[in-house]
Amino acid sequence: MTEKIYDAIVVGAGFSGLVAARELSAQGRSVLIIEARHRLGGRTHVVNFLGRPVEIGGAGVHWCQPHVFAEMQRYGFGFKEAPLADLDKAYMVFADGQKIDVPPATFDEEYTTAFEKFCSRSRELFPRPYSPLDNHEVSNLDGVSARDHLESLGLNELQLASMNAELTLYGGAPTTELSYPSFVKFHALASWDTITFTDSEKRYHVQGGTNALCQAIFDDCRADSEFGVPVEAVAQTDNGVTVTLADKRVFRALTCVLTLPTKVYADVRFEPPLPPEKRAFIEHAEMADGAELYVHVRQNLGNTFTFCDDPNPFNAVQTYAYDDELGTILKITIGRQSLINLENFDAIAAEIRKIHGDVEVLEALPYNWAMDEYARTSYPAMRKGWFSRYKDMAKPENRLFFAGSATADGWHEYIDGAIESGIRVGREIRHFMKATA
């Protein structure tokens, strides 16, 4: 029997890989999807907590994000709204652990002031945000850290602490490491509007969950698939690509799409080796040390939101669900998981009590993306000096094509960026196949 040679092997079944596979199969190409996990979704995933579906990875979507909105429209998915409006209570925990109760309207006003000052040049720097490097000043500013810029703005204590908490969440590292313009780009992508940006990151999720949207895209692929075994090696010649799995099975194709989280590339042997600029990006560019956590509290805390400044381990703590019978489910976004042992229930409970007083913490559901061997980072946050080099990672290498949200021109820490990159590599391979036919 003749060995099958695919037109394309797609490594990874997150949004970028699934969209790439669908685009290629729609061109009539034969496609094989290889996924190390036993599921779809990559760094998005829905699990059950107290009988409720909860997102433990990437989840924020919005109609200002054109690629994910198009997929939601295509497959008939609406928006689920998080309970962030009409807060009952808002809190700020400062770097030294001091907590203050802030009237929600004041909290919103002070944070918005800080955010708009931080992003005040977003239209000037990113007049066309899907061509983020067209303005050469962006590359010149890439070496400026978010913290350096933040401290230049003359903010008051609450403004500085709340914005630094937000930036720590996005950077997954001390804000002295995060590229200033890499964050400002998000404001530009949200039509240079702060409320739109905040809604895109915290307010709206996919109705039915990211799992269901991934499944809809997968069902639209005419592709073979292999789940549960990681890729060990990728070798290319002038004539094709050979992909070897950890169980030593070998698959061959004319092209290969790689959608691995950036730091996971170091676990794959490439022959010939990837070029120096890609290897440097893999080693140095990203730093997001993040995790997600849900906590069940016996008391009904109402609708609350808390920012905790670095080095507090919990950066954003918000009510997910609440009533007198349930008590409260809190959703916690952690920029730096290394600051707390998420396997230690008592440590988690102690942090919750720093915010909400003497409450009874009943249960916790953590997911540590930074310690996940198939993720290594929670999202592609860009270290200062590296945002301007993202195209080094996106550039094809002969028969190898690179996707994943880190390679996106637009929303690089979001589902939208992943989908954008999958569409791009579908186009790149179509052109490549025509040129080499």
From Swiss-Prot:
Record key words, sorted: Alkaloid metabolism, FAD, Flavoprotein, Nucleotide-binding, Oxidoreductase, Plasmid
Entry's Gene Ontology molecular function annotations: (S)-6-hydroxynicotine oxidase activity; nucleotide binding
Keyword Flavoprotein carried by entry: yes
Needed co-factor(s): FAD
Enzyme class, spelled out: oxidoreductase
Pathway assigned to this chain's UniProt record: Alkaloid degradation; nicotine degradation; 6-hydroxypseudooxynicotine from nicotine (S-isomer route): step 2/2
GO biological process, one term: nicotine catabolic process
Cofactor note (record): Binds 1 FAD per subunit.
Listed Pfam families: Amino_oxidase (PF01593)
Temperature dependence (free text): Optimum temperature is 40 degrees Celsius. Stable at temperatures lower than 50 degrees Celsius.
Domain of life: Bacteria
Function: Involved in the degradation of L-nicotine. Catalyzes the oxidation of (S)-6-hydroxynicotine (6-hydroxy-L-nicotine) to 6-hydroxypseudooxynicotine. Oxidation of the pyrrolidine ring of (S)-6-hydroxynicotine leads to the formation of the optically inactive 6-hydroxy-N-methylmyosmine, which hydrolyzes spontaneously to 6-hydroxypseudooxynicotine. Acts with absolute stereospecificity on the L-form of 6-hydroxynicotine. Also involved in the degradation of nornicotine, and catalyzes the oxidation of 6-hydroxynornicotine to 6-hydroxymyosmine, which hydrolyzes to 6-hydroxypseudooxynornicotine.
Activity control, per UniProt: Partially inhibited by Co(2+) or Zn(2+) and significantly inhibited by Ag(+), Cu(2+) and Hg(2+).
Catalytic activity: (S)-6-hydroxynicotine + O2 + H2O = 6-hydroxypseudooxynicotine + H2O2; (S)-6-hydroxynicotine + O2 = 6-hydroxy-N-methylmyosmine + H2O2
Stated family: Belongs to the flavin monoamine oxidase family.
Influence of pH: Optimum pH is 7.0. Stable between pH 6.0 and 9.8.
Subunit structure as annotated in this protein's UniProt entry: Homodimer.
Protein name as annotated: (S)-6-hydroxynicotine oxidase
EC number: 1.5.3.5
Binding locations of FAD: 16, 35-37, 43, 57-60, 231, 405, 413-415
